Amino acid sequence: WEQRKLGDIADIVGGGTPSTGNQSYWDGDIDWYAPAEIADQIYANSSQKKITGLGYENSSAKMLPPGTVLFTSRAGIGKTAILTRKGCTNQGFQSIVPHRGELDSYFIFSRTEELKRYGELVGAGSTFVEVSGKQMAVMELMMPPTMREQQTIGGFFQQLDHLITLHQRQPFLHSTPEI
């Protein structure tokens, strides 16, 4: 394995919020995530709030591609989810956009606990702790030298997460009365 800086294998992208006082910026069709929406799920499929194209154009929100790993950077540092379709976030994120061919989305998602510990360690702030994009970009990670190895490791954790999800649902399925 080799040591790499996160910023060398991914773009770290912050978010933004359109003015809440302008109704023409809201209730559109562009996904716009807030940290409270990121919990224990693996994938982020659709946000609770949506912004319009006008809201996007008039804010510092950035369009993130599918495969981006959303990373909460304040108020609960270190919650992650993988975007399944393009979307935006508010400023409570420093999202990880993997460079094609250099970083596998599920591999970096599988390192959530390491990302969280790092964010909590380097985060600063007097009102609430926050980790910046620059701080995230210099995070050192031990990485397999090839994308194929990352995908193999990421695939293993993906199967493991799938099994865990199935087992968590199993008691519910067995406790449902027959109709």
Protein language model features and the residues they cover:
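A short beta-sheet element
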Residues: 28-29, 34-36, 43-113
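Short acidic/His/Gly/Ser-rich catalytic and metal-binding motifs that mark active-site loops
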Residues: 41-44, 130-131
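ATP/adenylate-binding site constellation spanning eukaryotic-like Ser/Thr protein kinases
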Residues: 3, 35, 133-136, 168
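A short glycine-rich beta-alpha junction/loop motif
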Residues: 73, 87-94, 127-149
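Amphipathic alpha-helical segments with low aromatic content
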Residues: 1-2, 146-179
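Residue-level recognition of specific faces of alpha-helices
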Residues: 32, 92, 111, 127-130, ...
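Specificity-determining recognition surfaces
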Residues: 18, 23, 111-141
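Non-catalytic DNA-recognition/assembly elements of restriction-modification systems
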Residues: 1-16
